[in-house]
């Protein structure tokens, strides 16, 4: 039976970059790794309502630089920067080194796999029909300019007794093409019937010579004239 490799892991160093960048010897490697994991868990918990997609951690010369990619930067920053300063102080205590926080806004959340998965999961928790939630997310992504998108949900869909998997796809999603920029992420919806897993693949174009194809919104199909 064929198994699928992680779409991001296989592309690291080709079209994807690591979310943690630092050098460590054998004695400190495990310590750095655990601190990174706890830092991400802490930020995801603190910023649940801020639509956080990705957290990058860099450790240059006894400091830490954390970049938070979010669709709602105002919630992260807070009034007059109070919230982000409190985050910085807490993370400095937790990591044991001076921390600098950068915030990057996600301009097109419809093309971010994590944010799309979060949106579908939240709709499932509000008892929206799973097919409607998937179709709406797919149509929004294709309208903004995605080359292809696939969404898969697994679990007791609609409260069914037996769990099953359903998926919906539009456009191309070439998982075997290493130069293809595919954004992949997962999220969980906690419903009254149990946990429903959501997976999202978004194909944004091929990276050729270090340059990505420009994403353009798809033009609407020309209308056919009715026969008289």
UniProtKB/Swiss-Prot annotation:
Residues 39-107 form the KH type-2 domain. Transmembrane segments: none annotated. GO terms for molecular function: mRNA binding; rRNA binding; structural constituent of ribosome. Keywords: Ribonucleoprotein, Ribosomal protein, RNA-binding, rRNA-binding. SUPFAM superfamilies: Prokaryotic type KH domain (KH-domain type II), Ribosomal protein S3 C-terminal domain. It comes from the Bacteria. GO terms for cellular component: cytosolic small ribosomal subunit. InterPro entries: KH_dom, KH_dom-like_a/b, KH_dom_type_2, KH_sf_prok-type, Ribosomal_S3_C_sf, Ribosomal_uS3_bac-typ, Ribosomal_uS3_C, Ribosomal_uS3_CS. Part of the 30S ribosomal subunit. Forms a tight complex with proteins S10 and S14. Belongs to the universal ribosomal protein uS3 family. PANTHER family: 30S/40S RIBOSOMAL PROTEIN S3, SMALL RIBOSOMAL SUBUNIT PROTEIN US3C. Binds the lower part of the 30S subunit head. Binds mRNA in the 70S ribosome, positioning it for translation. This is Small ribosomal subunit protein uS3. The gene is rpsC.
